[in-house]
Amino acid sequence: KFRDLGVSARLATDDGSRGHHGFVTSLLEEIIQQEPERCTCLYVCGPTPMMRVAQNMANNAGIPGQISLEGIMPCGIGVCMACVVPCVNPDEPEAATWYERVCYAGPVFDIREVVLI
């Protein structure tokens, strides 16, 4: 289906059983270096360490995108504040950090704004 839309999909497996042998972030780095013109937007979800690496790559390369967060959301409506994540204004690096509720403002955020800890 992706090919019908002109989108290339690539597969990465840690053990090399299919597609790229290695972490998906090493494949992402390869694509950013070899085909920067194709890197128009990045959508990320997965384990936090992987998302942090992908986020850094996207931000360093100036690739816009979105990041989908999972978190403990006891109330699910933003009252308990258990799911807050720090955010920054990428256009004003000296500006203060603020916190957003994943269950209320997310779970999808601008890839440049969320601080993954």
Model-derived features with residue positions:
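Reductase modules of NAD(P)H-dependent flavoproteins
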Residues: 1-117
